């Protein structure tokens, strides 16, 4: 299961982006924020009271004329409803209750999703009375905040995470491996999934996914039990407005959050695009296992060196994730399709791999003997021992004399030693350095 998703919904100019930017400004323990994955920053990984979650800003749609406000608000709220675990419904305490607020409230009530009503722009104590009229929305007790002054944000987040507690017992079968298929329109995601389901003939069920235009297929194979998530929301018949594409990307992010393994599908004829890099970059940033599949390989004129050359070019474009596995297939002809789930399972096995502490320390001791840590300033790094503290991805803590002595090049050397000895292909690994006083 992925982290809970919290969407901020509201009509234009109520302060959605201001609130999001305040939350993403590391004032509430943001643990990871990845700018540049999309032109506008639309998500941030956050933590409050030990609950980790993904904040999504559904702002950025500012209608040019009044007659399109209602239709754009409906679209914005509907997509948030589909994908979010909890919705922050933001209203303007200075301007007061507006017809557009009432329309959104009606949609949210029908959704049965948890909603936290938040009255923004309550900058002074005397403005608190402005919140009372919002009881008329029928959404519950409002929380008053001032996003510009960072007032009341703690109370708001307390209300949000209360809903996570109610959700803790819910969940999908933990033994199932969730695989998200991502990529440009018409790259062959649905064709590949249909091929996999048709050949395995062991479909347990097809159920509607958590996002519109997305179907989750359950399939049991000799390699394990899988949930195949088709991010068909990116499929478009014609070029659409920027805000629609924005929401297609959000839906893809939601699917990535749920996944254990992300399969990036690339068209062998068109090659990799900037959008491909950004989307798979998000999967990399939040530490998912990754498999890159080049589809339509049957259409490429090739010799015995073509595949290696193509893979080298891909590795240059995806240099930020050198650990990724690669597979060249044709969903149409079935070429190497049988290897897709097998390879995805290999990625997952490495993603969840645990290494015994004794073996781990033997390898690191050998690595230190082969290459001594450099001197940083006047001090040389001493590594006392290392232990693995988690998986998804494999995470290792090195106990050292001074974490400031670790040079990035030596950290990379240690990570490479772990990879060479324990095979972490298909998954990133994390290394942390903590001080341990010498006895």
Swiss-Prot record:
<feature type="domain" description="KH-like">
    <location>
        <begin position="353"/>
        <end position="437"/>
    </location>
</feature>
<protein>
    <recommendedName>
        <fullName>GTPase Der</fullName>
    </recommendedName>
</protein>
<dbReference type="GO" id="GO:0005525">
    <property type="term" value="F:GTP binding"/>
</dbReference>
<comment type="function">
    <text>GTPase that plays an essential role in the late steps of ribosome biogenesis.</text>
</comment>
<keyword id="KW-0342">GTP-binding</keyword>
<dbReference type="GO" id="GO:0043022">
    <property type="term" value="F:ribosome binding"/>
</dbReference>
<dbReference type="Pfam" id="PF01926">
    <property type="entry name" value="MMR_HSR1"/>
</dbReference>
<dbReference type="Pfam" id="PF14714">
    <property type="entry name" value="KH_dom-like"/>
</dbReference>
<comment type="subunit">
    <text>Associates with the 50S ribosomal subunit.</text>
</comment>
<dbReference type="InterPro" id="IPR031166">
    <property type="entry name" value="G_ENGA"/>
</dbReference>
<feature type="binding site">
    <location>
        <begin position="57"/>
        <end position="61"/>
    </location>
    <ligand>
        <name>GTP 1</name>
    </ligand>
</feature>
<dbReference type="GO" id="GO:0016887">
    <property type="term" value="F:ATP hydrolysis activity"/>
</dbReference>
<dbReference type="InterPro" id="IPR015946">
    <property type="entry name" value="KH_dom-like_a/b"/>
</dbReference>
<keyword id="KW-0690">Ribosome biogenesis</keyword>
<feature type="binding site">
    <location>
        <begin position="10"/>
        <end position="17"/>
    </location>
    <ligand>
        <name>GTP 1</name>
    </ligand>
</feature>
<dbReference type="InterPro" id="IPR005225">
    <property type="entry name" value="Small_GTP-bd"/>
</dbReference>
<feature type="binding site">
    <location>
        <begin position="120"/>
        <end position="123"/>
    </location>
    <ligand>
        <name>GTP 1</name>
    </ligand>
</feature>
<dbReference type="GO" id="GO:0042254">
    <property type="term" value="P:ribosome biogenesis"/>
</dbReference>
<dbReference type="InterPro" id="IPR016484">
    <property type="entry name" value="GTPase_Der"/>
</dbReference>
<feature type="domain" description="EngA-type G 1">
    <location>
        <begin position="4"/>
        <end position="168"/>
    </location>
</feature>
<dbReference type="InterPro" id="IPR027417">
    <property type="entry name" value="P-loop_NTPase"/>
</dbReference>
<keyword id="KW-0547">Nucleotide-binding</keyword>
<dbReference type="InterPro" id="IPR003593">
    <property type="entry name" value="AAA+_ATPase"/>
</dbReference>
<keyword id="KW-0677">Repeat</keyword>
<comment type="similarity">
    <text>Belongs to the TRAFAC class TrmE-Era-EngA-EngB-Septin-like GTPase superfamily. EngA (Der) GTPase family.</text>
</comment>
<dbReference type="InterPro" id="IPR032859">
    <property type="entry name" value="KH_dom-like"/>
</dbReference>
<feature type="binding site">
    <location>
        <begin position="295"/>
        <end position="298"/>
    </location>
    <ligand>
        <name>GTP 2</name>
    </ligand>
</feature>
<dbReference type="InterPro" id="IPR006073">
    <property type="entry name" value="GTP-bd"/>
</dbReference>
<feature type="binding site">
    <location>
        <begin position="183"/>
        <end position="190"/>
    </location>
    <ligand>
        <name>GTP 2</name>
    </ligand>
</feature>
<feature type="binding site">
    <location>
        <begin position="230"/>
        <end position="234"/>
    </location>
    <ligand>
        <name>GTP 2</name>
    </ligand>
</feature>
<feature type="domain" description="EngA-type G 2">
    <location>
        <begin position="177"/>
        <end position="352"/>
    </location>
</feature>
């Amino acid at each position: 299961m992925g982290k809970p998703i919290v969407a901020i919904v509201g009509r234009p100019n109520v302060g959605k982006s201001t609130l999001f930017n305040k939350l993403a400004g590391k004032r509430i323990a943001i643990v990871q924020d990845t700018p540049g994955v999309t032109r506008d920053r639309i998500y941030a990984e956050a933590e409050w009271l030990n609950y980790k979650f993904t904040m999504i800003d559904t702002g950025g749609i500012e209608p040019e004329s009044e007659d399109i406000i209602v239709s754009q608000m409906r679209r914005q709220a509907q997509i948030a409803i589909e994908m979010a675990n909890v919705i922050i419904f933001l209203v303007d305490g200075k301007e007061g209750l507006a017809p557009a607020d009432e329309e959104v409230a009606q949609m949210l009530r029908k959704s049965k999703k948890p909603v936290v009503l938040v009255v923004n722009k309550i900058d002074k104590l005397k403005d608190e009375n402005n919140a009372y009229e919002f009881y008329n929305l029928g959404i519950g007790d409002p929380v008053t905040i001032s996003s510009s002054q960072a007032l009341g944000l703690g109370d708001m987040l307390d209300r949000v995470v209360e809903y996570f507690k109610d959700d803790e017992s819910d969940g999908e079968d933990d033994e199932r491996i969730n695989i998200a298929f991502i990529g440009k329109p018409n790259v062959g995601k649905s064709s590949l999934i249909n091929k996999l389901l048709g050949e395995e003939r062991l479909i347990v069920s097809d159920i509607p996914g958590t996002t519109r235009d997305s179907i989750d297929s359950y399939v049991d194979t000799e390699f394990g039990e899988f949930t195949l998530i088709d991010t068909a929301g990116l499929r478009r018949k014609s070029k659409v407005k920027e805000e629609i594409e924005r929401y297609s990307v959000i839906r893809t992010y939601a699917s990535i959050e749920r996944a254990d393994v992300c399969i990036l599908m690339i068209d062998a004829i068109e090659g990799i695009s900037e959008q491909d890099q950004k989307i798979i970059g998000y999967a990399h940033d939040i530490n998912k296992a990754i498999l890159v599949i080049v589809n339509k390989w049957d259409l490429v004129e090739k010799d015995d060196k073509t595949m290696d050359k193509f893979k080298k070019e891909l590795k240059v474009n995806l240099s930020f994730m050198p650990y990724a596995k690669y597979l060249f297939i044709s969903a149409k002809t079935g070429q190497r399709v049988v290897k897709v789930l097998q390879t995805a399972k290999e990625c997952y096995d490495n993603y969840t791999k645990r290494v015994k502490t004794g073996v781990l320390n033997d390898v690191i001791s050998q690595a230190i003997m082969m290459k001594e840590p450099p001197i940083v300033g006047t001090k040389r790094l001493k590594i006392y021992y290392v232990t693995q503290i988690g998986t998804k991805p494999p995470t290792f803590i090195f106990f050292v004399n001074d974490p400031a002595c670790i040079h990035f090049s030596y950290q990379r050397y240690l990570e490479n030693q772990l990879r060479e000895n324990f095979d972490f292909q298909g998954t990133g690994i994390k290394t942390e350095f903590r001080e341990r006083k010498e006895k």
